[in-house]
């Protein structure tokens, strides 16, 4: 049996972010010039590295591995203290001892996606050919590129077939891509709050964020690391705009309403008079301490390009035809970023392709981010699906 634990290290500050890009506080799988990653844009990326975390114990026949695919601005630190923020892991509602993704039962892997900034090769990494940060010289990547890199990592770990692939939002897109690109390697899959392609509205929101970043003079055409001035203002605005889409009108009303921030009367200025304004400003300012602006451009573009049906003559069901993977598709009633009809389209395509699929629409007012929050119905659904799949896979409560 192989027992692998996450690497622990000191909590970093925002100023150490470039160090995480090349030398992450994580496990690292390095791939040399003889193991290139073929990208959809036609470039062979080599050498490159993947930063990842693992939790739990891989059983003797390597049949209890779960791959968790993270969302856009998350990373591999889903169940351990984050090395930059010092905050708890990003998905502790779902991952950990006794949780639905039970680390006492399963061997859990989460890798930082290619193109991000927490240790996997991306625009914030050093280009070995120049000795400088890649910046916009880094090739444009796609969701399939991310999944191919993950498959290389899974190969490196000696795992032929994953018990389950789980993820929400951009992570859910990766789950769907895994099930299409490597159906024989995925026993079960749980795509959450996602779609098989990005809508025009979501592309528009992403373009708004990208333009905010690129309009910041400190962006310097992507060469801000060389100038020493980072486009924090533009990236903060991008984060503020995106964060609104992760919530719902009901959630904002319940949490903030029109309540004032530390005052009883308006200031008749452009200060943050309302609590919701102060909250958004905090979301923007805290985000820039842990995320790279160019990575934000690259990952949002990857989501925009995602379209499973495009590679199957526009017929989505053809992508899933003959799959033996067991699916559980989950949506949330107040999610207007990836509304329930998007999930129903996935279910219809899976049904047409002859797949085994269950579907759950969770009643909640928490919006898109509900999949990351303490949402009891969703947690119960995840637990039940994984337990059922584990029984079908022949895994006992100890993951053997």
From Swiss-Prot:
A GO biological-process term: homoserine metabolic process
GO cellular component entries: cytoplasm
Residue segments, region Disordered: 1-22
UniProt xrefs under InterPro entries: AB_hydrolase_1 (IPR000073), AB_hydrolase_fold (IPR029058), HAT_MetX-like (IPR008220)
Enzyme class: transferase
Pathway: Amino-acid biosynthesis; L-methionine biosynthesis via de novo pathway; O-acetyl-L-homoserine from L-homoserine: step 1/1
Family: Belongs to the AB hydrolase superfamily. MetX family.
Subunit structure: Homodimer.
Protein name: Homoserine O-acetyltransferase
Gene of this entry: metXA
């Amino acid at each position: 049996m192989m027992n692998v634990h996450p690497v622990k290290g000191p909590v970093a500050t925002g100023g150490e972010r470039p160090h995480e890009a090349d030398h992450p506080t994580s496990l690292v799988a390095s791939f040399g010039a003889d193991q290139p990653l073929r990208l959809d844009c036609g470039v062979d990326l080599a050498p490159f590295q993947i930063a990842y975390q693992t939790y739990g114990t891989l059983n003797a026949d390597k049949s209890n591995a779960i791959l968790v695919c993270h969302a856009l601005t998350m990373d591999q630190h889903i169940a351990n203290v984050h090395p930059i923020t010092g905050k708890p892991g990003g998905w502790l509602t779902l991952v950990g001892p006794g949780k639905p993704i039970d680390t006492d039962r399963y061997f859990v892997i989460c890798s930082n996606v290619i193109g991000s900034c927490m240790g996997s090769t991306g625009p914030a990494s050093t280009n070995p050919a120049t000795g400088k940060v890649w910046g916009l010289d880094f090739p444009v990547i796609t969701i399939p590129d991310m999944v191919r890199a993950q498959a290389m990592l899974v190969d490196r770990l000696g795992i032929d077939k994953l018990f389950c692939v789980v993820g929400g939002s951009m992570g859910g897109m990766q789950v769907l891509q895994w099930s299409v690109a490597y159906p024989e390697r995925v026993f079960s899959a749980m795509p959450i709050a996602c779609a098989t392609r990005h809508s025009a509205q979501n592309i528009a929101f992403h373009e708004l964020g990208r333009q905010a970043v690129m309009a910041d003079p400190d962006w310097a055409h992507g060469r801000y690391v060389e100038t020493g001035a980072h486009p924090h203002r533009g990236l903060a605005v991008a984060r503020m705009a995106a964060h609104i889409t992760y919530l719902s009108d009901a959630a904002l009303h319940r949490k903030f309403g029109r309540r004032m921030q530390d005052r009883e009367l308006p200031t008749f200025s452009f200060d943050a008079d309302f609590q919701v304004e102060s909250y958004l400003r905090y979301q923007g300012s805290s985000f820039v301490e842990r995320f790279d602006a160019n990575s934000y451009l690259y990952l949002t573009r990857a989501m925009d390009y995602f379209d499973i049906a495009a590679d199957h003559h526009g017929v989505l069901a053809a992508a899933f035809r003959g799959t033996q993977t067991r699916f559980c598709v989950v949506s949330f009633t107040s999610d207007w970023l990836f509304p329930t009809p998007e999930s129903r389209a996935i279910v219809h395509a899976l049904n047409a392709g002859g797949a085994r699929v269950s579907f759950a629409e969770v009643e909640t007012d928490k919006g898109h981010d509900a999949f990351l929050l303490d949402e009891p119905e969703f947690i119960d659904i995840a637990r039940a699906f994984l337990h059922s799949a584990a029984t079908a896979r022949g895994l006992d409560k100890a993951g053997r």
